Amino acid sequence: MFNVLGARLQQKKRTIAFPKEEPVLPDRFRGRPEIQQSLCTPDCRICAEACPTDAMRRDAEGLTLDMGRCLFCGECAAVCPLKAIRHTTDYRLAVRNRNDMILKGSEVALASALQRETLRLFGRSLKLREVSAAGCNACEADVNVLGTVVFDLGRFGIQFVASPRHADGILITGPISRNMMLALKKTYEAVPTPKLVIAVGACAISGGPFIDNPEIHNGAESTLPIDLYVPGCPPHPLTILDGLLRLIRAR
């Protein structure tokens, strides 16, 4: 016991000061994409053809990038001869509306807080039930790590619970396979109202690399109303945490 206490005193505090202090991320971190329309030529489609999920498209206003489909693979930036696309180190990606994930430049309408009455209920205590709907465990792992001493999700009043009956909402990962659809619906119905639905990762938002597969429902939006979208493949733990805190007005 004394050895344990001694080790604790020696290690001191290991929890990051986020959100009071901004995290320091490596230069290689692939965060929010940025499109420089001025560098892009109107007839070029090299990046769109290279994108594995059809996240890059061109309309009358220029290039658009759908972060809900984006795998953050960096292929578009790698093949662009004019370097009109790049990934910044900005980890803040969570939004409230699906259309806010369509980028035309560098600005993102970050997630706003819940409405006043809902915020009164969940602002200081938010219990979530996680549903892995045919996920690969990457998003699940980055959600799980929020419970470690580094991030300490519980200090914000947010916790994951074992039963949907004890939850205020569900957090979904995975592309929603046909075999998981019934389980997802039953979990949603078991959560008392009012309730929240959070889609984490490209798979849960759009189907990710499995888009239009006959066994996949292309994300949760076709089935449930989504209150928070957290794009990424997988999203960084800080991206998920930032979105959750914005939802309960802790940022």
Task: Set out the residue ranges of the language-model regions.
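Non-ligating segments of multi-cofactor redox enzymes
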Residues: M1-A50, D54-D59, A78, T88-V95, ...
